[in-house]
Amino acid sequence: FSYGGSATTNNSNSDGTNVTISNSKITTTGDNAGGIMTTGGGKTTANNLTINTSGTSSAAIRSDRGGGTVTVNKGTYTTVGTGSPSIYSTADITVNNATLVSKASEGIVIEGKNKVTINNTKLTDSNTKLNGQSTTYKNIFLYQSMSGDASTGTAEFTSKNSDIVTNNGDTFYVTNTTATINLTNNKITNNDSKGNFLRVQKDSWGNSGSNGGDVTLNMTNQEADGNIVIDSISTLTMNLKEKSSFTGKINSENSAKSIKLVLDKTSKIK
């Protein structure tokens, strides 16, 4: 547990708390029992850990109000409980060369003006149980809950040279926030025949009529397939470059508030 001393700010006014843990095994069985926790602007470095959590609201890599900075190198991080993603971010979290497994919850959740970056990492998600206000199954979830745990702003997910597997629901889901998704040279698989590549729409959070999403999707040397669904209060800007390709339907119901597609001469949409 790393607490930086500030309950209201992310990475500012911290007291400099810095926790490093290496080559360890962490197992939790209770509810609200995450594997590693960072809050209040603290800093955590985790090297080659094996984390298993089985309770509800028990993310393997977890942050809370005030956020901080988390760097994870190698290891395996597994959750089986409801509302327990492999990563829950109200911080700036980077994961390198690791394995992330979520069996009941979303794989990664990013709340508000916070970030998750994965490099050379395998993420496998099954999301078999809905939790709280959730109405859809998904793997990577970017949103603003309005609880006060995270500042309002752009939620950001970046993945490079990684393997992303979705077994139930949408690969990416965005609601009630502005979001940026950066994808470079990943293998992205959705095994759910009804799952979308990306869904952006209103949901249970925020004020009705203004609680959709505004998404910028950047693809670099990236292949992807599936459908993209954008509702009437949401927007998408999609940038493809360096031999990127997307195969699937985009806004097939013609419902989006706006969609902008930008392709360089080496990229294509099929």
Predicted regions and their residues:
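Surface-exposed loop/turn motifs in large extracellular/passenger domains
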Residues: 1-29, 37-57, 62-82, 87-104, ...
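Class I S-adenosyl-L-methionine-dependent methyltransferase catalytic core
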Residues: 268-270
